[in-house]
Regions:
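Boundary/junction segments of secreted and surface-exposed precursor proteins
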Residues: 192-207
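Ser/Thr- (and often Asn-) enriched beta-sheet segments in non-cytosolic proteins
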Residues: 56-58, 86, 168, 188, ...
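Active-site and glycan-interaction determinants of carbohydrate-active enzymes
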Residues: 137-182
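Acidic Gly/Asp/Thr-rich repetitive segments characteristic of extracellular carbohydrate-active
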Residues: 172, 204-244
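Predominantly extracellular beta-rich ligand-binding scaffolds that present long acidic/polar faces
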Residues: 1-144, 157
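Surface-exposed intrinsically disordered loops and tails
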Residues: 122-133, 157-167, 205-222
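Short coil/turn segments at beta-strand junctions that form active-site/ligand-binding loops
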Residues: 27, 54-55, 194-196, 240-244
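Short, surface-exposed, low-complexity cationic segments
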Residues: 180-192
C-alpha cells in the first residue's frame, strides 16, 4: 500500500497505482485534500483485523477514483463511518451517504461526473519499468473537472488551527485560494494567465519585419510563432500551465 496511519493528519498527497490499497487508516486520523487513484484493492481502507471502531477518523476534500470500480473499493471498512466522509469525490459512491459527496464515473476524458485529470494512469496497480518513465502522468485538473470548487474550507481551517498545517498551497506549491474557491484533491486548478496563452499561425512570405527589440514569442497574433511544438516548448521551459 501507499500510506499507513494510526493517528495524525494525512494532507495533500497523491497516492496512485499501488498493488495494495492507497491509504490504510487505523484510527484518530484526518484525511484531507488527497488524490488517490487506481490502487489495486481500495482507495482508503481499514485493517481487516482491527477491533477499534474508528470513530475518530474523518475523510474530507479528497478524490478517490479508479477505472475499474468492480474490482476496487473506493472506501473499504467504512460501513459504520460514512457520516465521517464529507466533500469527497469517490468512484461509484452512493451520494445519499456522508455529507456533500460526489459519485464519480470510472472514466476521465468524458462529460458528466468525471475527474478530468490532465493525464492519469490507465491501469490498476503497479506499473512496471520501462513503461512507467514514458507516461507523463499528471493529476492536475482540467477546467471542466467536476472537482472544481467542491471542497469545504472549514476542514483546512481546522488543520491550520489545531495542527499548524500550512494550507496556503497545494502539493505543487500553487495557491490554494483561487477565486475564493477550493477544489477537491491535492491539486488546486490554476486558471491560465494571459501570459501563458501563446498564438500560433502560418507566417506569410511577405511577413512585415519585427521592430528592434521585438521577439516572435507568441504573445500576440502579430508576434505569433509558426509551430505548435515551439509554443509547447516555451510553456514547458516556463514550467507553466498554458494554452496554444
Amino acid at each position: 500500500g501507499g500510506i499507513y496511519s494510526e493517528a495524525g493528519v494525512v494532507f495533500d498527497n497523491v497516492v496512485y497505482n499501488n498493488n495494495g490499497g492507497g491509504i490504510c487508516v487505523y484510527d484518530e486520523t484526518s484525511i484531507v485534500n488527497n488524490t488517490i487513484v487506481n490502487n489495486q484493492l481500495y482507495g482508503i481502507g481499514r485493517p481487516a483485523d482491527t477491533d477499534v471502531a474508528g470513530s475518530s477518523i474523518s475523510v474530507s476534500n479528497s478524490v478517490i477514483w479508479s477505472i475499474n470500480p468492480l474490482n476496487h473499493a473506493g472506501l473499504k471498512g467504512f460501513d459504520a463511518l460514512v457520516d465521517r466522509v464529507s466533500n469527497c469525490a469517490i468512484v461509484d459512491w452512493d451520494e445519499t451517504k456522508g455529507n456533500d459527496n460526489i459519485s464519480l464515473l470510472p472514466y476521465n476524458d468524458h462529460t458528466g461526473s468525471v475527474p478530468n485529470f490532465i493525464n492519469p494512469t490507465t491501469q490498476i496497480g503497479a506499473i512496471l519499468e520501462p513503461v512507467y518513465a514514458d507516461l507523463g502522468v499528471s493529476f492536475l485538473l482540467r477546467q471542466n473537472s467536476v472537482l472544481l470548487s467542491k471542497a469545504e474550507g472549514s476542514w483546512m481551517t481546522t488543520l491550520n488551527t489545531y495542527y499548524g498545517t500550512d494550507v496556503s498551497y497545494d502539493i505543487a506549491g500553487k495557491p490554494r485560494i483561487v477565486s475564493k474557491t477550493l477544489d477537491i484533491g491535492a491539486y488546486q486548478y490554476q486558471p491560465v494567465s494571459g501570459r501563458n496563452i501563446l498564438y500560433v499561425r502560418q507566417l506569410s512570405p511577405d511577413e512585415p519585419p519585427l521592430a528592434d527589440g521585438e521577439v516572435r514569442d507568441g504573445s500576440t497574433w502579430r508576434l505569433a510563432v509558426q509551430d505548435v511544438q515551439m509554443a509547447i516548448d516555451q510553456l514547458y521551459a516556463r514550467n507553466a500551465v498554458g494554452g496554444v
